[in-house]
Amino acid sequence: MEVANKTQQKHFVLVHGAGHGAWCWYKLKLLLESSGHKVTAIDLATSGANPKRLDEVDTLKDYCSPLLELMAAIPQDDKVILVGHSYGGFCIALAMDLYPKKISIGVFVASVMPDSTHPPNYFINQYYKWNPVGEDSTDTKVETFGDPDQPRTVIHFGPIYLSTKLYQNCTSEEIELAKFLLRPLSVFSNDLSKLKAFSEEGYGSVRRGYIMCSEDKAVPAGLQHWLIENVGASEVKEIKGADHMPMISKPQELCQCLVEITEKVV
């Protein structure tokens, strides 16, 4: 892969999925930087090394606050490429809605990708339609806490679920790393149920790309195709042999897809 010069250099902002952190991008970050690009990988609230606890974060916006703070600090004449993985698709969609002029393209990787017609919760329901609760969930645990009238849900990915549904094409060492670093997660369903659709003038004005993973067992191929057909993306790529974690199982291929997408649109 050619090394980008200063005029070709792009700024990639990498946004992890639920339960993960900036750490999961360690291979891709090095590859993009080696190609001459600038990379920022962030820890969302309650994730990675972020000190927030789940009982301190109530909303999607709270969860995304590190990303939104980063976007607010970017100069008005600069543009970044947002890359959102899995649940991180909601996070980059929120940033695209609030800061559309600071974003060249939002790239969704094996991710939920909302539109500007339906509220976010609609896409959570679509996910469960394609991937029913309890189906192949193996040892993943779901707990509730807080107000009994509006309980908060916490999800703990179990080691069997990790190795068979998320990381099945990764090495045993990579799976062990994930077991050490993953944190309990929430999808903030109470908040999502109250949110309106992202706006057409904000989110809808930013180009979207989608990277499919052919062997993803967490976001099924049928759902990925449905999102592309019904929501739409100007650039679509597929990584053959990639599980739900292409940044770990297929980092070279993911890097190539991102570079090719951005070369077309930026």
UniProtKB/Swiss-Prot annotation:
Q: Which GO terms describe its biological process?
A: alkaloid biosynthetic process; jasmonic acid metabolic process; salicylic acid metabolic process
What UniProt keywords apply to this chain's record, in alphabetical order?
A: Alkaloid metabolism, Hydrolase, Serine esterase
Output the InterPro entries linked to this UniProt entry.
AB_hydrolase_1 (IPR000073), AB_hydrolase_fold (IPR029058), MES/HNL (IPR045889)
Which pathway does the protein contribute to?
Answer: Alkaloid biosynthesis
Might you give the EC number(s) for this enzyme?
3.1.1.123
Which residues are the active-site ones?
86, 216, 244
Claim: Isomerase is one of the keywords in the record: no
What sequence ranges are listed for the domain AB hydrolase-1?
A: 11-121
Q: Which reaction does it catalyse?
A: 17-dehydropreakuammicine + H2O = norfluorocurarine + methanol + CO2
Molecular-function GO terms, alphabetical: hydrolase activity; methyl indole-3-acetate esterase activity; methyl jasmonate esterase activity; methyl salicylate esterase activity
Subunit structure, as described in the record: Homodimer.
User: Which PANTHER family does UniProt cross-reference here?
Assistant: METHYLESTERASE 1 (PTHR10992:SF1083), METHYLESTERASE FAMILY MEMBER (PTHR10992)
**Role, per record:** Hydrolase involved in the biosynthesis of curare monoterpene indole alkaloids (MIAs), natural products such as diaboline, a pharmacologically active compound used to regulate blood pressure. Curare alkaloids act as animal glycine receptor antagonists. Catalyzes the conversion of dehydropreakuammicine to norfluorocurarine.
Q: Which family does it belong to?
A: Belongs to the AB hydrolase superfamily.
Please identify the protein, giving its name as recorded.
Norfluorocurarine synthase 2
Q: Which gene encodes it?
A: NS2
